[in-house]
Amino acid sequence: MPVIQVNLTKGRTPEQLQALGEALTAAVEESIAAPRASIRVLITECDPEHFFIGGETIADLRASGRR
């Protein structure tokens, strides 16, 4: 049972998340011939203040125009 975990900052629409889940499922199904019903996709969204890159939050990077 393949499990794909995706961590994103908040801000995407339910339709975008649905499309991502469908695309990831299709990619796993095609690439490793996993049965579609066995593929799990877990999307976790977090606040930009809780997601760090190089010790700085995404919120700070966006505010400074560096992200």
Give residue ranges: language-model regions.
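A domain-level signal for the structural core that forms small-molecule/cofactor-binding pockets
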Residues: 1-67
